[in-house]
Amino acid sequence: MEDVYDLFQRGTRLLEEGEFHQATVPLRKAAAIEPEKASIREALGRAYFRSGHYEEAAVEFGAVVELAPTNDYALFCLGRSLLECGRAQEARKPLTLAAQLRPERRDYRIYRERAAKAA
């Protein structure tokens, strides 16, 4: 069995190199071994999002939000993933929460407003 840390490191390295689809392979394996590890689920969500798999990204970011409800980045990414899936109404809540948690983040406010207009 492969070590979770090695799988996570390989996946994040591939993410950094722009190999988003390839990054999902070790990150999926790591998430299967340690599904309660928010850092793994967040990295997998990022890999899915960057490879255009928005539904899968929403699932992963949703899992991170369940594990860490005040993780502003996960809330933001969940909202963005839902927007990309055409689910603007659902995207409003996580985007609003992210913007409230980090009011200095202009990008959070922009996407919150986009979701409100699209809903």
Report each predicted region and the residues it spans.
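Structural signature of tandem alpha-helical TPR/SEL1-like repeats
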Residues: 17-28, 51-63, 85-97, 119
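Mid-chain, well-packed structural core segment of small domains
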Residues: 62-84
